[in-house]
Design a protein with these regions (language model features):
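Short glycine/proline- and aromatic-enriched beta-strand/turn motifs that initiate or cap beta-hairpins
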Residues: 1-43, 107, 146, 207
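Residues that define the transmembrane beta-barrel architecture of outer-membrane proteins
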Residues: 15-19, 55-59, 92-98, 122-128, ...
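Residues on the lipid-exposed face of transmembrane beta-strands in outer-membrane beta-barrel proteins
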Residues: 1, 21-27, 61-65, 79, ...
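Sequence/structural signature of outer-membrane beta-barrel proteins
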Residues: 2-8, 36-49, 80-89, 113-121, ...
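Surface-exposed loop and membrane-interface regions of Gram-negative outer-membrane beta-barrel proteins
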Residues: 11, 28-92
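Outer-membrane beta-barrel "beta-signal"
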Residues: 164-173, 179, 192-207
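Repeated loop/turn-to-beta-strand initiation elements of outer-membrane beta-barrel proteins
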Residues: 29-35, 71-77, 106-112, 138-144, ...
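Detector for outer-membrane/organellar transmembrane beta-barrel domains
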Residues: 91-151
Length: 207
């Protein structure tokens, strides 16, 4: 459960709460696969019923492989297919993305995402992100990242996004609070949905 679903600095729920769930499988070899879902809302509240896109749910399917390179570095490569079942006839947002991650020193991660059919537009995009995660007293975890979403081929614009937050686990219960924002180019593409915002999350993990 999240007070809002934010993806790369943009609200995916018109700044409303989101219900989210996932099912994951991981093998000792490093192979993993899973399904992740969330409620979404891409149309403004004042949109006429006949102009609604019908996309109320996002379901992502992913497979990947992760392994250590040495005592300092590890990598993770995956493929994700973002789908939006229920979208009205003639509307198709589904698209694929390849994601590679390189993690070093146990805290720093560089991520590169590439799609050849971004938002089902037939255009390419790249996403670059650098982030870190640190343990704090009282079993808190601090994480922060900054990213650059190259959408020039899609929107003739690209933008920078960043986030910082705290999280803590209480057994099977995970609680988090994060701050998200983008630069002015993000708001040129997505308007107020890409401005600054705080998001609270509450999750349950079942092994």
């Amino acid at each position: 459960l999240a007070s809002e679903y934010v993806f790369r600095g943009q609200s995916q729920t018109q700044e409303d709460p989101a219900f989210q769930a996932s099912v994951d499988y991981a093998h000792a070899s490093g192979f993993y696969a899973g399904i992740w879902g969330s409620s979404v809302d891409f149309t403004a509240e004042d949109t006429l019923p006949e102009d609604e896109d019908g996309a109320d749910v996002e379901i992502d399917y992913y497979v990947g492989f992760a392994s250590d390179i040495n005592d300092t570095f590890s990598y993770d490569v995956s493929g994700v297919y973002y789908t939006y079942p229920g979208a009205n006839d003639g509307i198709d947002y589904d698209y694929p993305e390849l994601i590679g991650k390189l993690t070093g020193w146990g805290w720093a991660t560089f991520t590169l995402g590439y799609s050849w059919d971004t938002f089902n537009s037939g255009e390419t995009s790249f996403y670059y992100n650098f982030g870190g995660e640190w343990g704090l007293p009282w079993e808190l975890t601090l994480d922060s990242s900054i990213g650059y979403y190259d959408l020039d081929s899609v929107f003739d614009e690209s933008y920078v996004d960043w986030q910082i937050g705290l999280s803590r686990s209480f057994g099977f219960l995970d609680v988090g609070a994060h701050y998200y924002d983008t630069n002015s180019d993000g708001e040129l593409i997505y308007g107020d949905l890409a401005d600054s915002r705080f998001v609270l999350t509450l999750g349950f993990t079942i092994d």
